[in-house]
């Protein structure tokens, strides 16, 4: 039998077709800052995607090496400006581990409380901004209303609305103001009472569900391959949370309240659902911390430190479950008053790499929905 050869002949516009390269950003409003996406398109389909980062690189890790252990806290809370308290917390935990320092119980519980309030502030931003990117303007106003309630109590305790500078090596800057816990409890209750608006207005919206259901599905294998963490990973069925699996601060005593929310679909909708459910749980954890603080007797919230603080020679690694995922802090000391090296492992950096896996095969129209559902901060990527 004579073998046959098949030949495909293009007619008209298909006679010669070339892929188009499209640059999204680095000043596009959907990129949350100066992130650039280099897309290769075949018609309206994305065939390959490359996130191009570095436009906001400020050399934070190098700057750490020229500042002492008190000063680096000021730099540490700036790369992810929506999670400032959690960022500075990770740095002081690494230094305290290097020093072998025990932190007073009251400071431990206060840190846990403020970390969870910071988590809610972070999540509310994305609960409002993500529907906005898909064309729904109303939720962002509700989100900022609730953020303002919590920012007021955070500002009262620390003096800052964004960069709190409340952590210190060995504890906290100072104790909580008189009557603050009562006001904080009222703020948590007020926010909780109005959180249903996101269930009704966003998750109950068929247009939102149509834009996000089945779009940008990330497999558990890809989560492990790219080091994705946080709500994005848990939406793909990866049941891992450092607060439960390797407790730090007071999370070991909060296991009955802590609920690790997971989904299995791994799409944009699942990621939003995880973020919303995690916000509800963070409010519950904040209440549990307030209850525990009410039981504690007055006491110190920091340790006395020498005028010149030096960490012993060696290295250590601390990691925390930040609002956007796992942040790691690798500290190397040569016994001086400044770190020899402080390497940051930021959640946004790893999470955004998954775009190379998520975008190929999808429509350009779905790109913004997928990008926004990764819940990242550009400063956290570039540092």
UniProtKB/Swiss-Prot annotation:
Major localization class: membrane
MF terms (GO), sorted A to Z: NAD binding; NADH:ubiquinone reductase (non-electrogenic) activity; quinone binding
Catalytic activity: a quinone + NADH + 5 H(+)(in) = a quinol + NAD(+) + 4 H(+)(out)
Entry membrane topology: Peripheral membrane protein
Protein localization: Cell membrane
EC number: 7.1.1.-
The entry's keywords: Cell membrane, Membrane, NAD, Quinone, Translocase, Transport
Coiled coil: none
Matches recorded under PROSITE patterns: COMPLEX1_49K
A Gene Ontology cellular-component term: plasma membrane
Function: NDH-1 shuttles electrons from NADH, via FMN and iron-sulfur (Fe-S) centers, to quinones in the respiratory chain. The immediate electron acceptor for the enzyme in this species is believed to be a menaquinone. Couples the redox reaction to proton translocation (for every two electrons transferred, four hydrogen ions are translocated across the cytoplasmic membrane), and thus conserves the redox energy in a proton gradient.
Assembly behavior: NDH-1 is composed of 14 different subunits. Subunits NuoB, C, D, E, F, and G constitute the peripheral sector of the complex.
Similarity annotation: Belongs to the complex I 49 kDa subunit family.
PANTHER family recorded: NADH DEHYDROGENASE [UBIQUINONE] IRON-SULFUR PROTEIN 2, MITOCHONDRIAL, NADH-UBIQUINONE OXIDOREDUCTASE 49 KDA SUBUNIT
The protein, known as: NADH-quinone oxidoreductase subunit D 1
Naturally occurring in which organism (per UniProt): Streptomyces coelicolor (strain ATCC BAA-471 / A3(2) / M145)
């Amino acid at each position: 039998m004579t073998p046959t050869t098949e030949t495909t002949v293009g007619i008209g516009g298909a006679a010669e077709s070339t892929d188009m390269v499209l640059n999204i950003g680095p000043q596009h409003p959907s990129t949350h800052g100066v992130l650039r996406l280099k897309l290769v398109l075949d018609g309206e389909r994305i065939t390959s995607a490359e996130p191009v980062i570095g436009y906001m690189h400020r050399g934070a890790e190098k700057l750490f090496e020229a500042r002492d252990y008190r000063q680096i806290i000021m730099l540490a809370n700036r790369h992810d400006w929506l999670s400032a308290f959690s960022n500075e917390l990770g740095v002081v935990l690494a230094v305290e581990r290097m020093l072998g320092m025990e932190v007073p119980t009251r400071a431990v519980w206060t840190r846990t409380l403020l970390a969870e309030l910071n988590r809610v502030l972070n999540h509310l931003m994305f609960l409002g901004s993500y529907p906005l990117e898909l064309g729904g303007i109303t939720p962002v106003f509700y989100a900022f209303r609730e953020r303002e309630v919590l920012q007021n109590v955070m500002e009262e305790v620390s003096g800052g609305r964004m960069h709190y500078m409340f952590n210190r090596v060995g504890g906290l800057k100072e104790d909580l103001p008189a009557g603050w816990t009562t006001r904080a409890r009222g703020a948590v209750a007020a926010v909780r009472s109005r959180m249903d608006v996101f269930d009704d207005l966003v998750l109950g919206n068929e247009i939102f569900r149509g834009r996000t259901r089945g779009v940008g599905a990330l497999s558990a294998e890809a989560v492990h391959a790219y080091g994705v963490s946080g709500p994005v990973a848990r939406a793909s069925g990866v049941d891992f949370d450092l607060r439960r699996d390797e407790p730090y601060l007071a999370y070991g005593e909060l296991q009955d309240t802590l609920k690790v929310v997971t989904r299995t679909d791994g799409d944009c909708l699942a990621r939003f659902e995880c973020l919303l459910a995690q916000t509800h749980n963070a409010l519950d954890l904040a209440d549990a911390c307030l209850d525990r603080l009410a039981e504690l007797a007055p006491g110190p919230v920091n340790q006395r430190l020498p005028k010149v603080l030096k960490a012993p020679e060696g290295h250590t690694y601390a990691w925390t479950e930040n609002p956007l995922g796992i942040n790691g802090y690798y500290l190397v000391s040569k016994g001086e008053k400044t770190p020899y090296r402080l390497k940051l492992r930021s959640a946004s950096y790893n999470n955004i790499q998954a775009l190379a896996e998520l975008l190929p095969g999808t429509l350009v129209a779905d790109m913004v929905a997928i990008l926004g559902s990764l819940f990242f901060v550009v400063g956290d990527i570039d540092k």
